Amino acid sequence: MAHTEGVERDVSAALTFDVIDGTEVALLFAVSAAPIEQETLEVTIGDRDVPVEETRDRFGNRMHLLKDLPEGTVRLRYKATGVGQAEPPTVEPTDAASHLRPSRYCEVDEFTKVAAEVVGDRTGMAAVHAVVAWVHQHLDYVPGSSTVTDSARSTYVARQGVCRDYAHLTSTLLRAGGIPSRCVSAYAPGLSPMDFHLAVEALVDEQWVVVDATHLAPRASMVRIATGQDAADTAFMTTLAGRLKLTGIRVNAVANPGLPEENWEQTVQLR
């Protein structure tokens, strides 16, 4: 198990989007559970502050709601500094069953044969590593190559995608191979180009371990934002009413005193 004591992260997100009158938005951008030295959030339209309601969704994620927005350009600025290590993710009695099931972007039932070929007779972390290695070797990371409607099925056919596509295919193969799995959005120091990131957690030996077939950022310095079955549960922005157009996004994440070394065969928990 990787040890990350002493690692602190500074993260930030800036979103700009145009809305029509009456628009309502649900946002997932805030650090989920890790201790934070200082956290700020500013949301404005023009020179007016926008009221923000914070709640928790069914997965326990920190969700921010913007309701009945007037027409205009919304500017959101979020910053969290001195982000420490959260407690290890808890394992609930229902996790094993619920995280083997298909979900919107993970067509588990269609991948039973493929998963059997990839996993073979491996079990536990050996099976997890086999799936992650297969996805890493068989997909090309190509920014702009997929859309929000792409799923594990279309990614398997296209053999290319971005982090969400890697995560969906990885999680689907794990579930199809009998390993409970879920997706997790995160701030990822070291990621290039910098953006919100989507990785995967697998339930092995009664603990959630994080894996990432993109190999684009060290797992030990990632900061959890949201947890769910797939991107339908972890998307950073969901329009609840009205209409919006995202016109700008800027994400930043750094690890202090520096990025940890990554060993992709090592067991890591997202803290």
Question: Residues of each region from the PLM?
Answer:
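Short, charged, solvent-exposed linker or helix-capping segments at domain edges/interfaces
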Residues: 27, 88-94, 212
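Short low-complexity stretches enriched in small and charged residues
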Residues: 29-38, 87-89, 154-160, 164-167, ...
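Intrinsically disordered, low-complexity N-terminal segments that are enriched in acidic
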Residues: 1-85
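Low-complexity, flexible helical/coil segments
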Residues: 48-55, 61-66, 110-119, 217-223, ...
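Hydrophobic/aromatic-rich core segments of domains that either
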Residues: 133, 165-247
